C-alpha cells in the first residue's frame, strides 16, 4: 500500500516516474500496428506525423531529447487540426474524424509521462483498432485487429509488472491469454445481444464509387473490365441458372443526349410514382402459377441505392422496393456490405399495356442527331412487316457485317456518335451495340431502353455461390412489343455470342485477352493449383460475409427462433446469462488452474514438505509468514548466525519469485539438500 501511494505521489508531481522499458517498447510496436491499416484511407502526412511522434517519444525515453515545451505542443495541435481539415474532402466525413483521432493519439504519445497518460494512449489504441472496421470488415482485417489487440494489451500488462527485467514475450503471452479468455463472452454478446438501431448515424465510407453509373458514355462499360473487384455474391436456394440467363438488372437508361445515355427524369409521368419500400405496387407483373427463383445477394458498397437482381425481381428484404421500370432499389445508399433477398419470375410479362406517358419516354430522340442512323432504320422498317421482323433484321445485320467486339473501341464525338459507330468504326463494346439497337428501335417508333448491370459470373466450386466481378459489367437493350411487354434483346450475343455463354474472356481477341489478364487476377489462372487455392480463400471470405458481417436483425431473429422457439425477452435473457456464466466460469477455472500450477512449483513442494515436518516437532509456520521469514526463525531457534542461513533463503526466493531463474534439477537438488540438513539439525536439537 505504501508503495502504491508513493507511486501515485510521484506521478502526480510528473517527475521521477519512468514507464517500464518493456511496456514502452510494446506500446511503440502497438502504435505502428494500429495505425498501419488506416494508411489506405487517410492522407500520408498523418501517418508520417504518427511515426515522427513515435520516434520522438523513444528519444525522450533514451534521454537524448526532452519533452516538447507548451508552445510547441500548442503549435503542433493547431497545425495538425488545420491540416486534417484542409486535407479532408468533407470536414464532417468519417475519414476526417479518424485522421483527427490518429493525430491526437500520436501527439499524446509524445507528452506521455505518467501511468495515467499511458492508460489514455492505450485506450486510444483500442478505439483506433475499432475505427478500422468502419472502413473494412474483411476477415483479414479482423485477424489483423486481433493481433494488434494482443500487442496493445501486452503494453497494458507491462505497466503493471514490477520486475525490472521482464521479457516482452512474457507480456505478450499474458495478453494473448487475456484476449482468448474474452472470446467466449464476446461470442455470446455477438449472437444474443439485441441489434438496436442507432439514434443517429453518419454515412459510412465504402471507398470511391465503383461499378455501374447512372449515365453511360461509349467506353464506360469497357473501362470497368479493368477491375476484377467483386461487385456482389449471390447464393441461390436451388441450382444456379445457366450463364445466358444470368442478367443482373441494375439501371434503366431512357434519356439520350450528346452521346450519353442516362437515367434522366420521367417526362409527363403521373404523380405518386416513386417506389415505396415494402409496399404493394399496382404495376407489379402478374406471376401467379410461375415458380420463383429464390436467392440472396451480398452487395459490396456502391455509395448508391440501386440493387442488382434477375428479371423479373420481387423484393423480399425489408427496406427494398421495386421501381416503375422494374429495378430493385434500397431505401438508403449502400455504404457497407448489404444483404438482401429477392425472387425472380423469368416468365412474368411486364407492361402488357404500355401507358402513353411511358411510351413517350421510351421513344424520345434528340432532334437533328444521327441522321444516317435514322434514315437506315426507316429504310429497314419499310422492308419489315412487324417490329419483330425489324429487330431480327438489325441483329442479322450485326452478324453479317464486319462489326468487332473489343475492349479498346475508338473514341466517338458527342454529336452523331451512333452514326460514327454504326457506319464508320464498327468497333465497340456492349454499350455501343445496346445503344445503337435502342436508337434504331426508337427511330421507327418502337419503345426501347438500355439496361445496365452485370451478366454471367463465376461459380465457386467450394461453396457453390456465384461471384460477380466488375469485369462482368454489361449493357443490353429492352424493347416493348405488343402482347409481349418488355422483351430483353442483347445485340452483344449477335457479334460475340461467347460473351454471353462463356464470359468476357472467351469473347475477346488474343490482344484484348492479354490486356485483361495483365490487369486482373486472371493472369494467375494458368498456374496449376493456384485457382483452386483462390477459390478456397474466396469461399472463406464469403462465409465470413454471410455469417459474421451479414449477421443482422433478421438473421438473429431466425437463429433465435430455431434455438428457442418463441423469442421472448425472458428466454433471450436466460440464454445470455447462461452463456455469460459459462464464459466467466471458464475464466475462473483458468485462474484456479494457474494458481494451482504455481502452488505445485517444485521448489514450493519441497518447502511445503519441509514446513510440515518441522510442524510435527513444534515449529509450525505462521499463516502470514513468508518462506524466507520462516527459515530465518528456524535458524534463530537453532542459535546460528544469520549469515549461515542467508544463502539458502536467497536460493529459495530466487526459485520462487524470480521469473528469469529456471528451476533446474541441479538447483532443486541443492535446495532439497539445504532444507534436509536444516531439518536434521533442528530435529536433533529438539530431541536433545
Regions found by a protein language model. Name each.
Residues 81-85, 246-367:
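A cross-kingdom signal targeting lumenal/periplasmic-facing segments of multi-pass membrane
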